[in-house]
Design a protein with these regions (language model features):
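Cleavable N-terminal signal peptides
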Residues: 8-9, 19
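Short strand-turn segments of transmembrane beta-barrel domains in outer membranes
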Residues: 38-41, 64-74
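Bacterial N-terminal signal peptides that target proteins for export
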Residues: 1-7
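Glycine-rich nucleotide phosphate-binding loop and flanking beta-alpha elements
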Residues: 58, 73, 120
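Outer-membrane beta-barrel pore proteins
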Residues: 41-45, 50-63, 102-106, 154
Length: 413
């Protein structure tokens, strides 16, 4: 029984382990920011500042709206080691996480805003009969947040902000499980929800000179507790050995601390840079609890390193009607290679982006951008995962990439 249950728990552990570090995290909360490689902490000059750096809201005037969506098309492949070198790929799907922001300047010193976004919102789907079916078939996560933010201008040079984050989420993960000595595989599924979790954020914007700005943004941990049901379809003789019934899994996302700088090197050219620190080492245990006392609750250690993202961006004002943006970023994966799992394969990533802004009228700005993300090829030779419990390590080579297209509409009153 322990091995059969263990395979299911491994899926829970690695689902939690890689969702935030890997491709499930969505940083694209406005088309303009995406075009600039996400180097927006010291720019934050539209309503999406609610997410990137709330202190930037004091730069705005009147009432500002920003809505948009991003089409994300991720692809992952796995190829085993000799002699099993067949290449398997995830199902090709397009996802549309969206964002909406509204901000208002109440006085010279006070601004506020509220926004909706999807910080996680993708899934991976492998063929139900692929070689890694005992590790992962479907992994799906959707997390939504609503965040009100208040900003205060302390002086002509310095602004600060504070915000609350209300979040809810849905998760579904499936795999197969061997049911020796009976033929075929058991099918295991877990689906759960977290209906109410909270976090907070702070921002700071310092402009010692009209051409130069510094930004700091802090996003707290958010503690999720997924409550759901595990369902197993398999041989009735093994029903007591495979997980079923109510289950909870706790997950805490790490802090994010970002430092940014932006400088107008020319009257029409702005360059920006961000350093984003992700505090993974603060989360050391994943807890999985079963309502059925015949299954032992699990407390699984986390073997993670802190990580970081380096972002560079630029914007050029081509004319009164058009602006061009470009960016690049490097995202360091905190997951050790031996713990990479096909539920969410990932590695160090490079992102290359570009976009255009079109002022359709005095009040309306349309931004369109494109981002290509390429994960470095990752060959695992010492995997802690196994084809089946007690079998050969799940060694092989992962490749992942994604194409993203985003559009945002900004309107000011």
């Amino acid at each position: 029984m322990k091995n059969r249950l263990g395979a299911f728990v491994i899926l829970l552990v690695f689902f939690s382990a890689e969702l935030y570090a890997g491709g499930f995290q969505i940083n694209e909360h406005s088309a303009k920011a995406m075009a600039m490689g996400g180097a927006f902490t010291a720019v934050a000059n539209d309503a999406s500042a609610i997410y990137f750096n709330g202190a930037g809201l004091t730069q705005l005037t009147g009432t500002n709206f920003l809505i948009g969506t991003t089409a994300i098309a991720p692809v992952s492949t796995f190829r085993g080691v000799l002699p099993n070198v067949t290449e398997y790929g995830t199902e090709k799907k397009i996802f549309f996480p969206s964002h909406a922001w509204v901000a208002h300047r109440f006085s010279d010193n006070i601004a506020a805003g509220i926004g909706f976004t999807t910080p996680f919102g993708l899934e991976t789907n492998w063929d139900p009969n692929w070689v890694g079916r005992y590790l992962a078939i479907q992994t799906r996560l959707f997390v939504f947040t609503i965040s009100p933010v208040v900003a205060y201008k302390l002086s002509d040079q310095l602004s600060v902000s504070a915000g609350l984050v209300y979040s809810w989420a849905n998760v579904k993960i499936t795999q197969k499980n061997p049911q020796t000595p009976f033929p075929g595989d058991a099918f295991v599924s877990l689906e759960g929800n977290d209906n109410s979790s909270f976090g907070y954020n702070f921002g700071l914007m310092y402009k010692p000179d009209p051409k130069l700005s510094f930004g700091v943004s802090f996003h707290s941990q958010i503690k999720y507790s997924f409550e759901g049901t595990a369902t197993t379809v398999g041989a009735s003789q093994l029903a007591s050995q495979l997980p079923s019934g109510a289950v909870t899994a706790k997950l805490t996302t790490p802090i994010n601390l970002t430092f940014g700088v932006a400088y107008d090197v020319l009257p029409k050219l702005k360059l920006s840079a961000d350093f984003q620190y992700v505090g993974w080492s603060s989360y050391d245990t994943l807890g999985v609890d079963f309502a059925d006392p015949s299954f032992t609750d699990i407390a699984s250690p986390r073997l993670y390193d802190n990580s970081y993202i380096i972002r560079l961006g630029g914007e050029y004002k081509l004319s009164d009607m058009f602006e061009l943006q470009a960016g690049i970023y490097y995202d360091k994966d905190p997951v050790k290679a031996e713990y990479v799992n096909p539920s969410l394969p990932d590695a160090n990533r490079l992102g290359f982006s570009g976009g255009i802004g079109y002022h359709a009228s005095e009040n309306l700005l349309i931004n369109v951008s494109y981002l290509f993300i390429r994960s470095s090829e990752l060959t695992v030779t010492n995997s802690k995962e196994y084809y089946t419990p007690g079998n050969s390590p799940f060694n092989g080579t992962y490749n992942s990439y994604a194409n993203l297209v985003s559009i945002s509409l900004s309107y000011s009153l």
